[in-house]
Swiss-Prot record:
Annotated Gene3D superfamilies: 3.30.1440.10
UniProt KW keywords: Cytoplasm, Nucleus, Ribonucleoprotein, Ribosomal protein, RNA-binding, rRNA-binding
Family indicated by similarity: Belongs to the universal ribosomal protein uL5 family.
GO terms for biological process, alphabetical: translation
The organism of origin for this protein: Leishmania major
Any GO MF annotation of the entry: structural constituent of ribosome
One Pfam family of this chain: Ribosomal_L5_C
Subcellular location: Nucleus; Cytoplasm
GO annotations of cellular component type: cytosolic large ribosomal subunit; nucleus
Name used for this protein in its record: Large ribosomal subunit protein uL5
Record has Ligase as a keyword: no
Amino acid sequence: MVAESKAANPMREIVVKKLCINICVGESGDRLTRASKVLEQLCEQTPVLSRARLTVRTFGIRRNEKIAVHCTVRGKKAEELLEKGLKVKEFELKSYNFADTGSFGFGIDEHIDLGIKYDPSTGIYGMDFYVVLGRRGERVAHRKRKCSRVGHSHHVTKEEAMKWFEKVHDGIIFQAKKKKKMIRRRRR
């Protein structure tokens, strides 16, 4: 009886808080501006440039060099883009795509699979989708005035996120194979 009343509560309903789309080019310059145009065409808002945190000499990346573009989408537009992205993945994800916080992410190889026309001058870019799930009422933890805590039972868990994905998007979740532990032997 208590479980039924909890399920019927509209505040317990899981919603998409935001969708973050990232295209990492790995270098600044012309390829990055073309990736920015692709993301702007997809999201219909201006993307933000991301900078490298560290210098990696093997990849030829310097610290604070612009290497990626990302965009955060909310509301109905986020749900539409998520639907397009999941269509490309055929509504199939692996269990390790889901985080313990109830969020999940996946990547696609070609942006033209989302319905954008191919332009030879632009090229083809892959992108990462990261979906943050939450419940209504979580704003109380982030507001400026009368800030308070969100209870542990109100947080979205990994299992709840997986059930939500299977129910709302009729998705299929594959169980990830357990990795074998490698036994390293010392040479003597």
